[in-house]
């Protein structure tokens, strides 16, 4: 896009650490103790998200509870399923959460990972990151109204197909979209209530299971009968998306301190929400591996506690889908707002409603959900996973590049490892991504490539629209300037 005049809040607080070469955007940040005095902004009146709601927003961005982890037992047996949910967080979840904590506090704004990649690799790749992540988020979100109705159709068969199902999906999407419109703080506290309701039945189930536990059932393993594709995809599906919360960093109360702590608590909450239900279900019920598919926890609940506990688990599953929907939509819509504030999207995407929410971003995300809700998701969801993988590779590269090029930059939270440690930390999750990609089908890879090519075409189209002034692009004056050239700091580093 053409060069624009950028007005920063405080030029002295925005510092570059390298020359603006080719398409690279130099690092610039306002540190925790460098916040300049400025006139009150419109967004200052908007209530910020505090610790507890943020933890549960992270919980729903990543997990929502143990619904869907049953396939891990079906694919690999009890021992590998349990080991997977113990070991996998150290390979994937913790590195992703740590990178999100460091980069999210380095750039505490709603662009999140888009800004990280733009700063390290340039605006073209930053836009591609935004396109792939937003698209994968919308595809992901289109599943939840459908899954919600799938949990209810056993009690209300009319919701299984036809006009009642279509109408229900539309009404549910509108209601949850309106909740997002009313404000992120409301969404956060609703997520807390939904989260407590979704977790409690498994706590009850765990207590009831104690007298019937047989630890030997946890140790069953058959390496000759493992579906590695299903196993890895189940682990990956249930333990990713930690970076999604970064697109809400601008709405968080004191993000430099709140975000890292919330991610820490979120990792513990998510891991416990998987491991303890698996321990209870595997240890208290005789193993019938073929039955461990989506929804089997409701059968476990009935066997252990009766019909009332089964209904509670089913209601918790339905509630969990609503929680994941509102959390994902918040992340997707604020990402579009953050990209518009950085001049990557037309200015009208940065407009907020009277509740402080990105109205157009919400409408765009909701429209994508409604359009995709009528499709068959088996292949397209796998394609969404591949888009997410490519986006994560860009994030790892951006993280390492910033550590190498700007080691002395202000980082309110910094992972206590050096540059070599940063590279080593990214190797295991990168290998895992390669494994997921290698196990995917050619059809899925083809769909993913088509989606990426669309992103490659949209970026120059937006550049053309900007040059022709068909729509207005601008960079928010409330944000630090990522392109300001100040050699003094770099010279200080050299000395």
Curated annotation (Swiss-Prot):
Coiled coil: none annotated. GO terms for molecular function: polyamine transmembrane transporter activity; symporter activity. The chain crosses the membrane at residues 49-69, 79-99, 112-132, 156-176, 186-206, 230-250, 267-287, 357-377, 380-400, 417-437, 442-462. Keywords: Cell membrane, Membrane, Symport, Transmembrane, Transmembrane helix, Transport. It is found in: Cell membrane. Its main location: membrane. One of its GO terms (cellular component) is plasma membrane. One of its GO terms (biological process) is polyamine transport. It is a multi-pass membrane protein. Pfam families: AA_permease_2 (PF13520). Probable cell membrane polyamine/proton symporter involved in the polyamine uptake in cells. Belongs to the amino acid-polyamine-organocation (APC) superfamily. Polyamine:cation symporter (PHS) (TC 2.A.3.12) family. This is Probable polyamine transporter At1g31830. It comes from Arabidopsis thaliana.
């Amino acid at each position: 896009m053409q060069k624009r005049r950028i007005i920063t809040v405080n030029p002295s607080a925005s510092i570059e650490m390298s020359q603006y070469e080719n398409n690279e955007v130099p690092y610039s940040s306002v540190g925790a103790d460098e916040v300049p005095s400025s006139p009150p902004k419109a967004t200052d009146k908007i209530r910020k998200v505090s610790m507890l709601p943020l933890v549960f927003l992270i919980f729903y961005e990543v997990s929502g509870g143990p619904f869907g982890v049953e396939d891990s037992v079906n694919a690999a047996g009890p021992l590998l399923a349990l080991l997977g949910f113990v070991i996998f967080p150290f390979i994937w979840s913790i590195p992703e959460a740590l990178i999100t904590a460091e980069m999210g506090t380095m750039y505490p704004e709603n662009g999140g990972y888009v800004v990280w990649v733009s700063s390290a690799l340039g605006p073209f790749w930053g836009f591609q990151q935004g396109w792939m992540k937003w698209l994968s988020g919308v595809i992901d979100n289109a599943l939840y109204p459908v899954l919600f109705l799938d949990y209810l159709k056993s009690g209300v068969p009319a919701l299984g197909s036809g006009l009642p199902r279509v109408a229900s999906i539309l009404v549910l999407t509108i209601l949850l979209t309106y909740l997002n419109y009313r404000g992120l703080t409301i969404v956060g506290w609703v997520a807390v209530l939904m989260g407590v309701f979704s977790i409690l039945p498994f706590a009850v189930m765990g207590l009831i299971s104690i007298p019937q536990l047989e630890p030997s059932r946890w140790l069953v393993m058959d390496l000759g009968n493992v579906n590695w594709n299903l196993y890895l995809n189940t682990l990956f599906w249930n333990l990713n998306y930690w970076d999604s919360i970064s697109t809400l960093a601008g709405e968080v109360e004191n993000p430099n301190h709140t975000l890292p702590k919330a991610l820490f608590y979120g990792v513990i909450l998510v891991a416990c929400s998987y491991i303890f239900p698996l321990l209870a279900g595997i240890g208290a019920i005789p193993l019938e591996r073929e039955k461990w598919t989506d929804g089997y926890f409701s059968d476990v609940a009935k066997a252990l506690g009766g019909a009332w506990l089964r209904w509670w688990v089913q209601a918790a599953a339905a509630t969990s889908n609503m929680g994941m929907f509102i959390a994902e939509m918040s992340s997707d819509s604020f990402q579009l707002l953050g990209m518009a504030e950085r001049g990557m999207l037309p200015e009208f995407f940065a407009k907020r409603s009277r509740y402080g929410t990105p109205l157009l971003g919400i409408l765009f995300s909701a429209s994508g959900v409604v359009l995709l809700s009528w499709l068959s998701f088996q292949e397209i969801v796998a394609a969404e996973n591949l888009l997410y993988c490519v986006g994560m590779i860009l994030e790892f590269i951006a993280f390492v590049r910033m550590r190498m090029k700007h080691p002395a930059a202000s980082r309110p939270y910094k992972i206590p490892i050096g540059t070599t440690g940063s590279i080593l930390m990214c190797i295991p999750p990168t290998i895992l991504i390669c494994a997921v990609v290698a196990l995917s089908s050619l059809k899925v890879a083809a769909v993913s490539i088509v989606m990426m090519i669309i992103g490659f075409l949209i970026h120059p189209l937006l550049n053309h629209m900007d040059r022709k002034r068909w729509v207005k692009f601008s960079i928010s004056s409330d944000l630090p300037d990522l392109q300001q050239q100040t050699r003094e700091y770099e010279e200080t580093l050299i000395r």
